[in-house]
Amino acid sequence: MSVVEIEDGVYESTAVIDNGSFGTRTIRFETGRLAQQAAGAVVAYLDDETMLLSATSASKSPKDHFDFFPLTIDVEERMYAAGRIPGSFFRREGRPSTDAILTCRLIDRPLRPTFVSGLRNEIQVVVTVMSLDPKDLYDVVAINAASASTQIAGLPFSGPVGGVRVALIDGTWVAFPTVEQLERAVFDMVVAGRKTADDVAIMMVEAEATDKVVELVAGGAQAPTEAVVAEGLEAAKPFIKVLCEAQQELAGRAAKPTADYPLFPEYGEDVYYAVASVATDALSEALTIAGKEERNNRTDEIKVEVLGRLADQFAGREKEIGGAFRSLTKKLVRQRILTDHFRIDGRGVTDIRALSAEVAIVPRAHGSALFERGETQILGVTTLDMVKMAQQIDSLGPETSKRYMHHYNFPPYSTGETGRVGSPKRREIGHGALAERALMPVLPSVEEFPYAIRQVSEALSSNGSTSMGSVCASTLSLLNAGVPLKAPVAGIAMGLVSDDVEVDGKTERRFVTLTDILGAEDAFGDMDFKCAGTKDFVTALQLDTKLDGIPSQVLAGALAQAKDARITILEVMAEAIDAPDEMSPYAPRITTIKVPVDKIGEVIGPKGKMINSITEETGASISIEDDGTVFVGASNGEAAQAAIDKINAIANPQLPKIGERFLGTVVKTTDFGAFVSLLPGRDGLVHISKLGRGKRIAKVEDVAKVGDKLRVEIADIDNRGKISLVLVAEEEAAEASDNGSATPSDKAPATADATTAGN
């Protein structure tokens, strides 16, 4: 592996990923040819067919009034990458797809902590997908491309960052798996990290069990238990190392010198010393208050007092006083956890807050549930509908439709604040996607449960891990809606605090893992680790850390601790509901039938005439798939059965015979007679000469109008299948009725009589 100058000023480095019997993948980085005015630009290739351009730029002057690092990541999906024209009205790309937004988050999470602290210049990384092999996923390539372009941009960046997707296929962890290979995987995860002196520091993990995991495990595949997931993280490290080395070699030849950027530390040492001297005692006491609101009110009071006491001494440096106060709060919270193993709300490190689960909360919803964990409160609401209501996806990913949709809402009142409401922000999209992935492996197939499912999670109150609360509320709500889940799923958020502690005159690194973290513990801790799963295996996992790597034994311990908490939560959820409820009376009843593929056109009819007619007459909704699967949905079973009977009459017809009698509906009149509907798609003609019951009539409309019911008998069927009808004598019709002959529903166009000619 080395850098090659392929032409003047154009450099290339290569990383070869060896998957053993699964083959090799080649990731190539090139710079110097495209986007030359960007601070750093790299084109990343995956096996030559997939091509992404990443360009990193920085503003010339800092935004010193910001109290955060203004990093922006954008992913641009170009439809020409797949040889397609966008399906929008204007035929050009518009707002980013969900896949693009989730990829932005995958890039941001490992890159952001890699920049020097205090940087306030605006940094923008734009990744453009220019070519995509349909067998590949571009998200992990984008992580490496973004890191490589930033590494050569002359920024204070301590990268590079390597990103890899590894999937557990036939007991082997395979890097950069193809879409086809993922069909055989039981677990799939994206891992990003940095190369250290003797190891790889894991910075970010996004993982999930596949939707085939239950079937594959039942067939003998290895279940993705906590131990297996930990092995997968270790398996990802050599691949990340190779990717980081390729980026480092490219930067060694092509990187700009690191420029001097002004840094704006949160506070000066003199400010921190002053704040600590006046606030430590009062703040330490306030941080033992268990209730969030009461604790926050008290710490706010102390902050105001500190600002008042130090305002004259540090005039014009009020922002630094606020930063120092926050840093002191962080130090005290962490100190108590590390030394006393007690947290700010008084819990031990493995304690879970009070749990509550309840179903059937929203009256007319198809399914609903309320899940509470301490001050975190999530309302889950399930809606069922026809499969045709599945979300259609127009993106570069392999997924074209989505039957299960999970939408997460985080209104400002959930934290007692005001703010914008409306379209979801990136965080809400990311949290919804995480909860969706957690539940996908346990959802029934469309054959088992022919419904589109929309799950909405409303974060009504937030103090720690609303995303994992959404997983729990969704499981409860889905069961309440009657969805036959393969297993219930629960989630928990874990945290980590670490520091060097003096023990018997020696300094040792101490790690303390926290179960069920609060919002403050998330902000002040070293790791945010969300884990969801059943009682038997992990279904989804998300990890972000601020440390340069977490020891394997610490991570394995956190996974085991998370499982213990998950089992406890599942037991509480089972008390509320442990099996699917009866479906709501307000939910549609959907039945599936099969028709021959060559009969689909007849069921639909010219310009949809036949299917629209059935829908209007029965009130049922009908959806037909290309393979002949027909989904019939209705508010009651009778309407659904009526629609099914009509569809079967067309697709699997029993041809009427001479002598059969029907109560038919006049559907058309002409100068020569009246057409009467006998069965769906099967009409017969009563000639004008047969309409007068032996009397001559001048106009058909004098005796038969469209919509009239006529008792008719089949007199003849010619060799072309045309049916000639005659009216049944009134006395015969009355006699048949008195003898109990079947009288069809007025809604039905026709139904065969029980009597036939000769009876």
From Swiss-Prot:
Domain S1 motif: 659-728
Listed CDD domains: KH-I_PNPase (cd02393), RNase_PH_PNPase_2 (cd11364), S1_PNPase (cd04472)
EC number in record: 2.7.7.8
Assigned keywords, A-Z: Cytoplasm, Magnesium, Metal-binding, Nucleotidyltransferase, RNA-binding, Transferase
Taxonomy, superkingdom: Bacteria
InterPro entries linked: ExoRNase_PH_dom1 (IPR001247), ExoRNase_PH_dom2 (IPR015847), ExoRNase_PH_dom2_sf (IPR036345), GPSI/PNP (IPR014069), KH_dom (IPR004087), KH_dom_type_1 (IPR004088), KH_dom_type_1_sf (IPR036612), NA-bd_OB-fold (IPR012340)
GO cellular component, one term: cytosol
Main location: cytoplasm
Catalysed reactions, as listed in the record: RNA(n+1) + phosphate = RNA(n) + a ribonucleoside 5'-diphosphate
Positions of the UniProt region annotated as Disordered: 734-759
Signal peptide: none
PROSITE patterns: KH_TYPE_1, S1
Biased composition, class Low complexity, residue ranges: 741-759
Keyword Transferase: yes
Keyword Iron-sulfur among record annotations: no
UniProt GO MF annotations: 3'-5'-RNA exonuclease activity; magnesium ion binding; polyribonucleotide nucleotidyltransferase activity; RNA binding
Annotated localization: Cytoplasm
Limits of the KH domain: 588-647
Names of the cofactor(s): Mg(2+)
Membership in a protein family: Belongs to the polyribonucleotide nucleotidyltransferase family.
HAMAP family from the UniProt entry: PNPase (MF_01595)
Role of this protein: Involved in mRNA degradation. Catalyzes the phosphorolysis of single-stranded polyribonucleotides processively in the 3'- to 5'-direction.
Protein name per its UniProtKB record: Polyribonucleotide nucleotidyltransferase
Organism: Mycobacterium sp. (strain KMS)
This protein's encoding gene: pnp
